[in-house]
């Protein structure tokens, strides 16, 4: 039996060997919404430019940006006596090997694991840690809840977009979103990282929740670290342009964002 999860959809699946194999096994593919980067795209980015890293910035990790990853985690082995485990993340488009830092020591992989560090393997060469928080169930689906690239100047913007995606992916609102706003704290155990909380009222209607989340994402976006056009791109499937313009005008009136001089700027950026 295949251990791969039916996660993701590849428009070029006809040319994808792993996708063809899945089709042969009659395992259906599931379309993941929005602009997803699936595993084959991550691998492709790494292979096309494996030397893209420079200093602390690993350019090909950009394949993770805006990612929704729904994959199956397969346990491979423990690494000596360390709290690290080696595993494989697979979806319908391919697989990558990962090294995961377990939340606590145990003889076996717990039923649920909070993983905080993932080390990507590219053709046997290990690269700098990618930090993430994953909720995973052994041999089951795994959902990316939190993502950042260590020592990357654009880390905060990825957090914000990730929050948007996480919210839109879920059927119900979440009371509290949280992400780090001080990337130095990742590498300084004594630093107190600032956190921004996006408070979502579960009693609100879904549309109102989405509007409120969009408002807060825009508000906590100093110097437009996330291009507004990208933020709106992810909300357009949930909101119409009239609703978007209404909330933008509210933010401008409240001096929470700068006026851009055009109601349609988001479509023209």
UniProtKB/Swiss-Prot annotation:
Residues 1-22 have a biased composition (Polar residues). InterPro entries: NA-bd_OB-fold. GO terms for cellular component: chromosome, telomeric region; DNA replication factor A complex; telomerase holoenzyme complex. One of its GO terms (molecular function) is DNA binding. It comes from the Eukaryota. The gene is RPA2. Component of the heterotrimeric replication protein A (RPA) and holoenzyme telomerase ribonucleoprotein complexes. As part of the RPA complex, binds and stabilizes single-stranded DNA (ssDNA) intermediates, that form during DNA replication or upon DNA stress. It prevents their reannealing and in parallel, recruits and activates different proteins and complexes involved in DNA metabolism. Thereby, it plays an essential role both in DNA replication and the cellular response to DNA damage. Its main location: nucleus. It is found in: Nucleus; Chromosome, Telomere. Keywords: Chromosome, DNA-binding, Nucleus, Telomere. Residues 69-149 bind DNA. Component of the replication protein A complex (RPA), a heterotrimeric complex composed of RPA1, RPA2/TEB2 and RPA3/TEB3. Component of the telomerase holoenzyme complex, composed of the catalytic core (the catalytic subunit TERT, the telomerase RNA template component TER and TAP65/p65), which is associated with two heterotrimeric subcomplexes: (i) the replication protein A (RPA)-related subcomplex, composed of TEB1, RPA2/TEB2 and RPA3/TEB3 and (ii) the CST-like subcomplex, composed of TAP75/p75, TAP45/p45 and TAP19/p19. Belongs to the replication factor A protein 2 family. This is Replication protein A 32 kDa subunit. Residues 1-25 are annotated as: Disordered.
